[in-house]
C-alpha cells in the first residue's frame, strides 16, 4: 500500500475511534511504531469495538462512544465470547468459506488489544498522574500458539531458502535470465526498475533486515565504505547492521540511475523509490512483496521477503555456528528464535554425512 493511501486509511479509522484510542495512537507514534503496525492495530480495534456495540456489551450506538468504563469492567467471559465470535465468522477468513479466522489472526487481535490495555492501565497519565484505570482483563486471557515442532518448521521452510550458491544464483537470474521470460511489452517495465529491484533483494539477502526496515532505509543510512546500513528496529531502536560485500555492486548500480530514472530531488531522502505521475516517493512494502514473489517464482519457488531474511540467517549460522551472532544480525533480543536455523543446518549436515 502506498504511504499516501495508508495515511488516508488511518485517518478514516481515527475518525470513528474513541478519544482514548486516538491518545494511544499519538503516544505510539512517538515510540515510534510504524504506520503499518498502527494501521493494523486500528483495524483490530474497529473490529473489537464494533463487536462491543453489536453484541450489546457496550450500550451505545457507535464505537466512538464506547467509554473507558466499558473496557475497565469487561469480563474474561466477555473476551472469550469475542474470541468465539471470531472463530465462528467465516467471512473474516479469506482462505475458507467454512471456518472462522485462523489462530494466528486471533493472536494478532489479542496482541493489539493487550497493547491498548497496557497503555490505558500502566502508561497513560490522567490529571492526577494516574492511569485511566488499573484492571487489565487482557492479562487473564491466554493465547494459543500454533503447534509445530522445529523439525516440521525446518522441513517446511528449507525448500524456500536460497542457500549456498543459490543466493548469488537468484541475483544472477534476475540480472541476466529473467528478461528472457518476458513479452516485449513487459520488457520496458522490467528494465526501468531492474537496478532498484536487484538492490532491494540484495540488501535483504546480504543483511537479513526486515522488509519494514528495508523500505525505510534513507540515503544517509547506507555506508558503502564500512558496509553498514542503519535501520530502525522494532520498538524504535536504531541499529547499525553490517551487510555482506556481494550487495555493494548492486547498490552502486542503482545509485547510478536513481536520480535520473526516478526524477529525485534533494528532498527525496528515501533510498528505494518509485515513480508515479513523475513524482518520486518511497517504495511501499506491498510493492517489494510483489517483486520478490515475481522474481522468485520464475527462478525456483515463490517466496516472501521474510524468507530472504531466513536465507541470510541460515547461511550466517552455517558459517559461524553462533546463535548469538545471528540474533544480533537479525535484531533479536534473545537467541531462542534462532533455534530454527540451527535445526535447518543440522539437517543439512546430517544429509551430507549420510551421503559419504
UniProtKB/Swiss-Prot annotation:
GO biological process, one term: chromosome segregation
Residue ranges constituting the Tyr recombinase domain according to the UniProt record: 169-354
Compartment(s): Cytoplasm
UniProt keywords, alphabetically: Cell cycle, Cell division, Chromosome partition, Cytoplasm, DNA integration, DNA recombination, DNA-binding
GO cellular component term of the entry, any: cytoplasm
Domain Core-binding (CB) residue range list: 16-121
Pfam family, one: Phage_integrase
MF annotations from Gene Ontology: DNA binding; tyrosine-based site-specific recombinase activity
Broad class of where this protein is predominantly found: cytoplasm
Regulation of this protein's activity per its record: FtsK is required for recombination.
The keyword ATP-binding is annotated on this UniProt entry: no
Record: active site: 210, 234, 306, 309, 332, 341 (o-(3'-phospho-dna)-tyrosine intermediate)
Classification via PANTHER family: PHAGE INTEGRASE-RELATED, TYROSINE RECOMBINASE XERC
Family: Belongs to the 'phage' integrase family. XerS subfamily.
UniProt function note: Site-specific tyrosine recombinase, which acts by catalyzing the cutting and rejoining of the recombining DNA molecules. Essential to convert dimers of the bacterial chromosome into monomers to permit their segregation at cell division.
Protein name in the entry: Tyrosine recombinase XerS
Organism field: Lactococcus lactis subsp. cremoris (strain SK11)
Amino acid at each position: 500500500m502506498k504511504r499516501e493511501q495508508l495515511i488516508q486509511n488511518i485517518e478514516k479509522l481515527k475518525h470513528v475511534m474513541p478519544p482514548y484510542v486516538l491518545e494511544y495512537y499519538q503516544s505510539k507514534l512517538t515510540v515510534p511504531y510504524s504506520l503499518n503496525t498502527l494501521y493494523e492495530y486500528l483495524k483490530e480495534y474497529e473490529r473489537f469495538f464494533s463487536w462491543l456495540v453489536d453484541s450489546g456489551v457496550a450500550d451505545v450506538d457507535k464505537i466512538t462512544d464506547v467509554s473507558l468504563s466499558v473496557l475497565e469492567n469487561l469480563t474474561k467471559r466477555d473476551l472469550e465470547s469475542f474470541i468465539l465470535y471470531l472463530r465462528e465468522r467465516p467471512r473474516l477468513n479469506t482462505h475458507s468459506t467454512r471456518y472462522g479466522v485462523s489462530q494466528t489472526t486471533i493472536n494478532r487481535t489479542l496482541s493489539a488489544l493487550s497493547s491498548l490495555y497496557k497503555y490505558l492501565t500502566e502508561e497513560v497519565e490522567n490529571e492526577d498522574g494516574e492511569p485511566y484505570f488499573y484492571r487489565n482483563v487482557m492479562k487473564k486471557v491466554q493465547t494459543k500458539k500454533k503447534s509445530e515442532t522445529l523439525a516440521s518448521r525446518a522441513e517446511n521452510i528449507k525448500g524456500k531458502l536460497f542457500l549456498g550458491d543459490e543466493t548469488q544464483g537468484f541475483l544472477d537470474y534476475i540480472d541476466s535470465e529473467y528478461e528472457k521470460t518476458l513479452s516485449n511489452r513487459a520488457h520496458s517495465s522490467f528494465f526501468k526498475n531492474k537496478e532498484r529491484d536487484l538492490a532491494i533483494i540484495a540488501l535483504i539477502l546480504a543483511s537479513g533486515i526486515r522488509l519494514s526496515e528495508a523500505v525505510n532505509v534513507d540515503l544517509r543510512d547506507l555506508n558503502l565504505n564500512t558496509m553498514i546500513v542503519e535501520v530502525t528496529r522494532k520498538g524504535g531502536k536504531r541499529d547499525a547492521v553490517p551487510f555482506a560485500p556481494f550487495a555493494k555492486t548492486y547498490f552502486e548500480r542503482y545509485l547510478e540511475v536513481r536520480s535520473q530514472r526516478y526524477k529525485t530531488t534533494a528532498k527525496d531522502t528515501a533510498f528505494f523509490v518509485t515513480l508515479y505521475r513523475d513524482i518520486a516517493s518511497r517504495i511501499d512494502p506491498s510493492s517489494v512483496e510483489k517483486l520478490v514473489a515475481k522474481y522468485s517464482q520464475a527462478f525456483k519457488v515463490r517466496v516472501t521477503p521474510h524468507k530472504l531474511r531466513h536465507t541470510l540467517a541460515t547461511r550466517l549460522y552455517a558459517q559461524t555456528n553462533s546463535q548469538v551472532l545471528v540474533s544480533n544480525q537479525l535484531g533479536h533480543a534473545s537467541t531462542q528464535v534462532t533455534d530454527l536455523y540451527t535445526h535447518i543446518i543440522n539437517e543439512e549436515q546430517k544429509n551430507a554425512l549420510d551421503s559419504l
